A protein has these predicted regions:
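Active-site microenvironment of metallo-dependent hydrolases
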Residues: 1-44, 48-54, 64-65, 381-471
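Active-site gating loops and adjacent loop-to-helix segments of metal-dependent hydrolytic enzymes
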Residues: 94-125, 152, 180-196, 217, ...
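Alpha-helical scaffold segments that flank or form the walls of functional sites
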Residues: 96-145, 150-170, 200-215, 462-470
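Metal-coordinating catalytic core of metallo-dependent amide/deamination hydrolases
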Residues: 153-291
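Glycine-enriched alpha-helix->loop->beta-strand junction motifs that scaffold or abut catalytic
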Residues: 168, 240-248, 281-284, 301-310, ...
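Histidine/acidic-residue-rich catalytic or RNA/ligand-binding cores of hydrolases
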Residues: 183, 258-270, 298-303, 320-329, ...
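His/Asp/Glu-enriched, well-ordered alpha-helical/loop segment
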Residues: 278-285, 327-412, 427-430
Length: 471
């Protein structure tokens, strides 16, 4: 890649002023727009003005553009929308490498007591470590499912929001919760759960404090009780009512394991999908993580209601939870995005890896035609944007959308000679990330974070992990 900054200062490349914006121009690159028509260009241009995409097309950029502050030669590169992560647990970044041979329930029972010791300082470090891995793998927008809030843990959600703002990432945090402890027949220890009313009040406070409904919002909040085996029906129902009264989305875990299926049938007399439906938890404003153990009826209900799915292939394999029926979901019209899940069940935390693993796992179950490279890329971009309710703002490269984009090198020693640049990205080795823009601002350059000190993040993560283990 060559860069011409002769017409302006890189530091002032994006002002966010959409009335008279400076422009970033990328030319001579392959482009996968992931728009509704899957438009691609073998050699094209992308023009960014302020925090919006101004133009995408074949050949060089239009002549006569004013206030071009950065011009990039994208020869040998593929430009795609920034990836969108639909499920994570940032606090787990400081508990990686534990419970390595467990199924979900045993893994949780092992780690709940450890997580009971987290605090806001630890979670700030963990969030930055998690976000660093995401950004360096091409992710521009992420959610996080925070559901452990120890009584003396401080402002955990605020610490996460501050951490991602410092890195420049678009964020959709959730205020999660648990109120069904072991004394009531739930899985988490009582020390990890909250009072139902207190959890709902804290969720309302988080929405009022942090949620931004504007088009280019960098923070939007979601209500997210944890799971059927850690949350009472009262909290699930109350959270749904609260979220809809405030116009925010809903998120939880659903149909992840056979143990969850057995728990729901024994305790509620129905499977997870029917149980959650009975509490108002199906709809276009809802997405659920995993959704592995679903029959045709469950998939049909998700499709009919527009309920979304966060598919987490690496995590599902790590704890041997099963293989989600993603091709069947897509065929039925279910919105599906990709998630890395928490780093305690997916130590790499890289969303780019999930493109490949989603394809491989789908084919393992359904054969070589089960999922294509372009379908995998769509899951990680437009699919994730739809699941998060932001399909009009992000997820594809189209004029008027927000300038969240990734520029991948596909002519290096590991990718040169691969005929199809999308296949190079999805099926090849992890492609070097030359540039990542979030809201029109550079957040990754030449594979490294451009707004923070990576070594400082590493030191803070190490200290936080050691402090937690010492508790």
């Amino acid at each position: 890649m060559s860069v011409d900054n002769s017409t302006g200062s890189t530091a002032s490349a994006v002002t966010g002023d959409t009335t008279a914006p400076g422009r970033i121009v990328i030319e001579n690159c392959a482009i996968a727009t992931v728009d509704a028509g899957d438009t691609e260009y073998d050699s094209g241009h992308v023009v960014v003005a302020g925090n919006r995409i101004e133009a995408v097309g074949a050949g060089p950029a239009p002549a006569g553009l004013e206030r071009v502050v950065r011009r990039i030669d994208g020869t040998g590169h593929l430009v795609t929308p920034g990836l969108v992560n639909t499920h994570h647990h940032f606090y787990q970044w400081i508990t990686r490498g534990l419970a390595q041979e467990c199924n979900l329930f045993d893994w949780l029972v092992t780690l709940y007591p450890v997580w009971a010791g987290i605090d806001d300082e630890m979670c700030h470090a963990a969030a930055q470590g998690s976000a660093a891995a995401l950004l360096r793998s091409g992710c521009t927008t992420s959610t996080d499912h925070a559901y452990v809030f120890p009584k003396d843990g401080g402002d955990i959600l605020g610490a996460e929001i501050r951490a991602l703002a410092e890195l420049g990432m678009r964020f959709q945090p959730t205020r999660g919760s648990m109120d069904l402890g072991t004394s009531q027949g739930g899985l988490p220890p009582d020390a990890c759960v909250e009072d139902t009313d207190a959890a709902l009040a804290a969720t309302a406070e988080a929405i009022d404090r942090w949620h931004d409904a504007s088009f280019d919002a960098m923070v939007r909040v979601t209500a997210a009780p944890c799971s059927p085996f850690s949350v009472t029906p009262e909290l699930l129902r109350g959270a749904a009512e609260l979220a809809r009264s405030k116009g925010v989305r809903l998120h939880t875990h659903g149909a992840e394991t056979v143990e969850e299926e057995a728990f729901c049938r024994e305790r509620f007399g129905m499977g997870p999908t029917d149980y959650l439906e009975s509490l108002g938890w199906l709809g276009e404003d809802v997405w659920m993580a995993h959704c592995i153990h679903m029959d045709d009826s469950d998939i049909a209900k998700f499709a009919a209601t527009g309920t979304g799915v966060a598919h987490c292939p690496s995590s599902n394999a790590r704890i041997a939870a099963g293989i989600a029926r993603v091709p069947d979901m897509l065929a039925a019209g279910v919105p599906v995005g990709l998630g890395v899940d928490g780093a305690a069940s997916n130590e790499s935390g890289e969303l780019g890896t999930e493109l490949r693993n989603a394809l491989l796992i789908a084919r393992l179950r359904g054969g070589p035609g089960a999922l294509t490279a372009r379908q995998a890329l769509r899951l990680g971009t437009a699919g994730g944007a739809k699941v998060l309710g932001r399909e009009h703002e992000i997820g594809s490269l189209e004029p008027g959308k927000l300038a969240d984009l990734a520029m991948w090198r596909v002519d290096d020693v590991l990718h040169s000679g691969i005929a199809d640049p999308v296949a190079a990205l999805v099926l090849g080795a992890a492609a070097p990330l030359t540039l990542l823009l979030v809201n029109g601002r550079e957040v990754v350059e030449q594979g490294h974070l451009s707004r923070v000190d990576e070594e400082e993040i590493a030191r803070n993560v190490s200290r936080a992990a050691a402090r937690l283990r010492a508790k």
